[in-house]
């Protein structure tokens, strides 16, 4: 792995096996996350971004299975370690904030029970020390009356408070990598801004890397250093955040940005991407985006493009850039 690389994903393939056959949810995904870097993975629902994060966490369960590729984290190959070794990593060096905090927290146990368990699992401390560390973490994420919240049940807290609890749990053991899967879903814009500000602050303090899974381009612009755009289980574009927003290369990325509401475009018709993401049964033979692409050619219909490098340093899976330097790996 390159110097400074914390997470390296190479040609990851995660399939789900159904009565009608194997469904490739993630198909040949490759990317890296460096120490202290925030990488955003964006795309429509069903593009494979959440399955990618679950694959990294070792949480893909039957009928799903990782059938190919390599995941390396901090020098270790995760695709070959045992579940017992994975449990030592999860919540410790490798943490995740899930989409919905209400369903991610156990309603039968107090916040203190659940937060304390994470600390006791990974640190050599007493129950009292774990309690004090838990209360300290709740205060750190901006929760008032932390002692009272520690004794509370999830249903007694608001959505924003529950999400802060999830962040406290994820960061309790100072992980090297935090995977945040739609961390601000279903939160109002004020709470969303507070959560994003909180994540930036805590990550800066601990030099934690973030893999941010989202469909919200506003969150991406605010948080990310690097952006990965996924479509139908593949990476279709990768670039630094400034390049991607200034000069999007792939027609799908261009469509995503064009369909984002703009407060300065009053009275203008909101653009959209025609069509829908293909299913396993309707997956095109060539480029997966060609049925929805305004620039599609005959080559796009019959040949699947590789990931190529543009003159601006972006990596893009599109025949419009054929002849440019091909992306390595």
Where does each model-flagged region fall?
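A short, flexible loop at the N-terminus of ABC-type nucleotide-binding domains that lies
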Residues: 2-6, 15-28, 59-65, 81-85, ...
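Short catalytic/signature loops enriched in Gly
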Residues: 4-5, 144, 238-329
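P-loop NTP-binding/switch modules centered on Walker-like glycine-rich loops
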Residues: 58, 179-183, 187-268
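Conserved ABC transporter NBD signature motif
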Residues: 66-77
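Conserved ABC ATPase "signature" region
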Residues: 76-77, 128-148, 257
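ABC ATPase NBD coupling module
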Residues: 78-95, 121, 243-248, 278-284
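A short, proline-enriched helix->beta-strand linker immediately N-terminal to the Walker B motif
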Residues: 172-176
């Amino acid at each position: 792995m390159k110097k400074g690389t914390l997470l390296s994903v190479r040609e990851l393939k995660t399939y789900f096996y159904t009565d009608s056959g194997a469904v490739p949810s993630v198909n040949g995904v490759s990317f890296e996350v460096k120490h202290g870097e925030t990488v955003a993975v964006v795309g429509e629902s069903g593009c494979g971004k959440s399955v990618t994060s679950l694959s990294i966490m070792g949480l893909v369960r039957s009928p799903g299975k990782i059938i190919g590729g390599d995941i390396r984290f901090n020098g270790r190959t995760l695709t070959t370690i045992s579940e017992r070794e994975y449990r030592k990593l999860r919540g410790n060096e490798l943490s995740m904030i899930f989409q919905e905090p209400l369903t991610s927290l156990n309603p039968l146990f107090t916040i203190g029970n659940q937060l304390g368990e994470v600390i006791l699992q990974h640190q050599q401390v007493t129950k009292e020390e774990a309690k004090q560390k838990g209360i300290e973490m709740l205060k750190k994420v901006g929760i008032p009356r932390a002692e009272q919240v520690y004794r509370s049940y999830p249903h007694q807290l608001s959505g924003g408070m529950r999400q802060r609890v999830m962040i406290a749990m994820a960061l309790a053991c100072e992980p090297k990598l935090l995977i945040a899967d739609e961390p601000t879903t279903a939160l109002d814009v004020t709470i969303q801004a507070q959560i994003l500000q909180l994540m930036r602050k805590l990550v800066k303090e601990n030099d934690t890397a973030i893999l941010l899974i989202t469909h919200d381009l506003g969150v991406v612009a605010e948080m990310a250093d690097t952006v990965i755009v996924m479509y139908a289980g593949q990476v279709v574009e990768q670039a630094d955040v400034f390049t991607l927003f200034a000069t999007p290369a792939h027609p799908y990325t261009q469509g995503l940005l064009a369909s984002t509401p703009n407060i300065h475009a009053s009275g203008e018709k909101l653009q959209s991407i025609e069509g829908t993401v293909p299913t396993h049964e309707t997956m095109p033979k060539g480029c997966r985006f060609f049925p929805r692409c305004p620039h599609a050619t005959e080559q796009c219909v019959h040949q699947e493009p590789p990931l190529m490098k543009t003159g601006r340093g972006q990596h893009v899976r599109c025949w419009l850039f054929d002849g440019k330097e091909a992306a390595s790996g």
